[in-house]
């Protein structure tokens, strides 16, 4: 199986398109780590977990990356690159229903500037 995937990432959302299935998914560009276990969530699930008090949410990931910043979650510092990697991996998993990374033939990622336009 050969998959072609496009991702669009900005501070507010991540969208993914799987060409073969004409599948488009979009989610808020946030990650949340569950307090009890080392489980991570993205998008609306992440917001629900954080609002219930059961998770720690991080947002504005591209801005964090641009500043070279880190986010401390459950007493552990994560780089913006690590958090964005979690976000992208989770979106790819959702798009491909957990298919192996070897099945991805092409992956194109468009990043929107973290700066606000005037």
Model-predicted regions and their roles:
Residues 2-9, 108:
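Short glycine-aspartate micro-motif
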Residues 13-110, 115-117:
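Conserved phosphate-binding loops in N-terminal lobes of ATP-dependent enzymes
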């Amino acid at each position: 199986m050969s998959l072609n995937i496009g991702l669009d990432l900005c501070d507010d959302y991540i969208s993914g398109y799987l060409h073969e299935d004409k599948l488009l998914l979009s989610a808020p560009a946030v990650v949340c780590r569950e307090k009890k276990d080392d489980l991570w969530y993205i998008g609306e699930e992440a917001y629900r977990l954080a609002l219930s008090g059961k998770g720690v949410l991080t947002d504005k990931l591209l801005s964090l990356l641009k500043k070279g910043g880190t986010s401390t979650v459950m007493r552990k510092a994560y780089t913006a690159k690590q958090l964005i990697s979690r976000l992208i991996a989770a979106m790819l998993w959702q798009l491909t229903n957990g298919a192996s990374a070897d099945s991805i033939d092409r992956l194109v990622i468009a990043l929107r500037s973290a700066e606000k336009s005037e």
